[in-house]
Amino acid sequence: MIPPEIRRSVLLQKAIKLALAGTLLTFASFSATAADPSSDTETPQPPDILLGPLFNDVQNAKLFPDQKTFADAIPNSDPLMILADYRMQRNQSGFDLRHFVDVNFTLPKAGEKYVPPAGQSLREHIDGLWPVLTRSTKNVEKWDSLLPLPESYVVPGGRFREIYYWDSYFTMLGLAESGHWDKVADMVANFGYEIDAWGHIPNGNRTYYLSRSQPPFFAFMVELLAQHEGDDALKEYLPQLQKEYAYWMEGVETLQPGQQNQRVVKLEDGSVLNRYWDDRDTPRPESWVEDIATVKSNPNRPATEIYRDLRSAAASGWDFSSRWMDNPQQLSTIRTTTIVPVDLNALLYQLEKTLARASAAAGDRAKASHYDALANARQKAIEMHLWNNKEGWYADYDLKNNKIRDQLTAAALFPLYVNAAAKDRAAKVAAAAQAHLLQPGGLATTSVKSGQQWDAPNGWAPLQWVAAEGLQNYGQDDVAMEVTWRFLTNVQHTYDREKKLVEKYDVSSTGTGGGGGEYPLQDGFGWTNGVTLKMLDLICPQEKPCDSVPSTRPASLSATPTKTPSAATQ
């Protein structure tokens, strides 16, 4: 039986068959014009809308261990025809749903297990993985949920067969470190293409990810490319930077104090900040059954509200974390859309500063001043509303209760990362992180053990890099060294035992991959590879780079992070 809260997706099939058929024709033409983002195409529909009750029934039948499998399956013919056949056959005696799926869909192939050559150092292993993780989808099948991209790209690994937005920046750090500037340029071009095609960078290049974005790292990507190409990169991608900013700020002009619209929030004092948001409020196709179960566990809340908050947490990249929940042990208390995240607003500060720099490079001083003013206003709002003076760290703002939240998370390091923190406050954040988050194997995401993957005891490579670089920005080199050395030791010990790098690590010790979440631990792994290479160069002298973590801990970090040219330490 289809849950009432998603019945509209099913009824849509009956009510607008002609319109949907038109959408399918548009989708067919879309794949043929993938390299031309200027072509006027409608947004392709995700599989839960294309397949309606069939999608719901397959996912609820749990035919596959991973719900993402059927979301990524490719219809072998027109989905409307498959759906019509399903309606006719499903009530017949002896109907076999799995057989029907096997006949009518091409399931994603399991990736061949990569066996690295014996005796490789950590650096050699990572360098050998780049071609293994590289994909090209310039052309895709007509009804594939995969969205084509004009250039090749590097995927995270494991079950993740597509490109992901914020993952990619940390992967690109490693590509640059390995000298693959051509791949860095290709990936920036792909994200620029997505902005032109969809008005934003989606969570990933799948139709079911189009309704949301992820932490906005495109400005950092362009700044990274500018290290190699100079200001030409800034000037080339200025239009896309402006479009991404417009996406995050959509509706701000009409907001009154105390109002919110999609991704933008205006507080009672007129301060403008942002939140995570997904345009849809139904179960995620890639986690269909899990989301329905979460909703059923809390019948006192509107289902659509929970669905949107689950989706918005996926947009945050932290899916899931006690950070978004009223009760850390109950996922259905999630309320991402009523929380103003400190890391998101730090990243948008960086976007504003990059827009100012790019505008200046293009000779538009007026625009540069405009974006600088927006960045300064955001910085003041961060200091005013996202600083917990009682606790002594940056935190998220609670729109529901109109107050700063008390929880310390690794997101507190983001204002340091973008050079937006006051120096005295940066010192307090460093002390808090060292006292409450630093563990033997690196920096814990939070201090809460909820069973969710973005909580203790897990540590994630991107947050280690944000912390290490942010701490160095403010002269907190000792704490930066602790984070760097402990995490690298964890990565090295795991690699020595298992000959792989993984998505996340248990930082309560060293040598163990992380747990929790909706799927098994994944290896590969794009952002861990990138951060590991960058950190190896932090602990080893530039004149004598190391290929593995040294047996003896260095006295200090050997290199300083690349300062963001558009931001200055306060």
Swiss-Prot record:
A cellular component annotation (GO) from this entry: periplasmic space
Where does this polypeptide localize?
A: Periplasm
Q: Which InterPro entries match?
A: 6-hairpin_glycosidase_sf, 6hp_glycosidase-like_sf, Glyco_hydro_37, Glyco_hydro_37_CS, Trehalase_periplasmic
Biological process according to GO: cellular hyperosmotic response; trehalose catabolic process
The positions flagged as active site in the entry are 319 (proton donor/acceptor), 503 (proton donor/acceptor)
Q: Where does substrate bind?
A: 159, 166-167, 203, 212-214, 284-286, 317, 518
The cross-references to PROSITE patterns, in alphabetical order and at most eight, read: TREHALASE_1, TREHALASE_2
Report the EC number(s), separated by commas if there are several.
3.2.1.28
Q: Where is the signal peptide?
A: 1-34
Single GO term (MF): alpha,alpha-trehalase activity
Annotated catalysed reactions: alpha,alpha-trehalose + H2O = alpha-D-glucose + beta-D-glucose
Keyword flag Hydrolase: yes
Give the residue ranges for region: Disordered.
Answer: 544-570
| Biased composition, class Low complexity, residue ranges | 554-570
UniProt keyword terms in alphabetical order:
Glycosidase, Hydrolase, Periplasm, Signal
Q: What does it do?
A: Provides the cells with the ability to utilize trehalose at high osmolarity by splitting it into glucose molecules that can subsequently be taken up by the phosphotransferase-mediated uptake system.
> What is annotated about its quaternary structure and interactions?
Monomer.
Question: Which family, according to the similarity comment?
Answer: Belongs to the glycosyl hydrolase 37 family.
What is this protein's name? Answer: Periplasmic trehalase
Tell me what organism the protein belongs to.
Answer: Salmonella dublin (strain CT_02021853)
